[in-house]
Regions:
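Conserved helicase RecA-like core
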Residues: 2-377
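Basic Arg/Gly/Lys-rich low-complexity intrinsically disordered segments
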Residues: 262, 290, 355-416
Length: 416
């Protein structure tokens, strides 16, 4: 299928061609027709699936079909962080370059005057973080009486960052009659309950978790004791060609600790996670993109806003308990056919995660032994506990109409 077959108008098709889009991703193919029909939608998709385009493109088409009053916000996209909000707004601007629709992003951590002046000029589509949006609403600067489309993006991350209460306050303010688009990578109970409160007879779109890695990524395992991991990282960074390295840490505290130790070794490094202010996260990301900072240490949730096309090096300081996370982490490199390299540090506590990860991707990851911190004990442990015939995990089927399992309560979603 191509974008023309999705029924998109020529101004949008032309903009997509400029962006180099040729074929829709699975979530775009499934979601765009339903959103064009103005249905509510519940989408489960990870970062890197083309999710933003899946809702931005049909929103632009639906709004372009009617005469717009610039003093009335018609679409609101609510997202948890400044960096994600900026990224979404950049996408809206790219897709709408041939349309008369105007989008704006607002977020906290900066003075509000400039954002207020832009709002006064008129906006069709508003991308916002919860706190700044509520500030503007309470001051009477933003009115949402004419809102037609509400998008809640990264709902699980909203929960993780403590924004669910703010989201519920916003829901009480916006018109009850509207189209709702709800996206979440995971579906914990509280998020499922929130979805049931918001959505009306939704179309459910679930993109199966990615289980394969790009052939352009050179993957490797380093067996190393936990206490030697930072020393190993510093050892690898002695190679100056590793000029831009994204390091994944399992915890916020761990990310800070790694960044401090690298800094103490005269290696420029910053940490990015949910406890950092939006200003601090954006500054760290900007420094990393411009290569002022050589190493960015991130937690998985914070890394969702990181989109760097030419990133070549990713380090898994620990392996995640969720095997699919490995695929998403190393998928930050080796994009669009370019070459990338991933280094994964494995200690005794990581062995079970390594086995499940290799089962998911259907292949063994090569082990690098020629480094000062290699331990044969870990190799033997892995070999002894993994001597069964190796078979890859079957890939889950992708289903567009079968999403999350409904709880026994039949009223999971409101009916019209």
């Amino acid at each position: 299928m191509n974008f023309e077959q999705l029924g998109l108008i020529k101004p949008i098709l032309d903009a997509l061609k400029v962006q180099g889009y040729e074929q829709p991703t699975p979530i775009q193919e499934k979601a765009i027709p339903s959103i064009l029909q103005k249905r509510d939608l519940l989408g489960s998709a990870q970062t890197g699936t083309g999710k933003t385009a899946a809702f931005a493109i049909p929103i632009l088409q639906n709004l372009s079909e009617k005469e717009q009053n610039r003093n009335q916000i018609k679409a609101l996209i609510l997202t948890p962080t400044r960096e994600l909000a900026i990224q979404i707004e950049e996408n809206f601007k790219a897709y709408s370059k041939n349309l008369k629709l105007k989008s704006l992003v607002i977020f906290g951590g900066v003075k509000q005057h400039a954002q207020e002046q832009q709002l006064k000029k008129g906006v069709d589509i508003l991308i916002a973080t919860p706190g700044r949006l509520l500030d503007f609403i309470s001051q009477g600067i933003i009115k949402l009486h004419h809102l037609e489309i509400f998008v809640l993006d990264e709902a699980d991350r909203m929960l993780d960052m403590g924004f669910v209460h703010d989201v519920k306050r916003i829901l009480k303010i916006i018109p009850a009659k509207r189209q709702n688009l709800f996206f979440s990578a995971t579906m914990p109970k509280e998020i499922a309950n929130l979805a049931s409160e918001i959505l009306v007879n939704p179309i459910k779109v679930e993109v199966a978790p990615v289980s394969s890695t790009a052939d352009t990524i050179q993957q490797s395992i380093y067996f190393v004791e936990k206490d030697n991991k930072t020393d190993l990282l510093i050892h690898l960074l002695q190679d100056q060609k590793l000029d831009q390295v994204l390091v994944f840490s399992r915890t916020k505290h761990g990310a800070d600790k790694i960044a401090r130790k690298l800094h103490a070794s005269k290696i420029s490094a910053e940490a990015i996670h949910g406890n950092k202010s939006q200003n601090a996260r954006q500054n760290a990301l900007n420094n990393f993109k411009s290569k002022k900072t050589r190493v960015l240490v991130a937690t998985d949730i914070a890394a969702r806003g990181i989109d760097i096309d030419e990133l070549k090096y990713v380090v898994n300081y620990e392996l995640s308990d969720v095997s699919e996370t490995y695929v998403h982490r190393i998928g930050r490199t080796g994009r669009a056919g370019s070459e990338g390299t991933s280094f994964s540090f494995v200690d005794g506590l990581d062995l079970a995660n390594l086995r499940s990860t290799e089962k998911l991707i259907g292949k063994k990851i090569p082990v690098v032994k020629n480094h000062p911190y290699h331990t044969d004990d870990l190799v033997e442990q892995k070999r002894d506990s993994n001597n069964k015939p190796f078979t890859p995990r079957p890939k889950p089927q992708q289903k567009s109409e079968i999403g999350f399992k409904k709880p026994k309560n039949k009223g999971f979603f409101r009916k019209k």
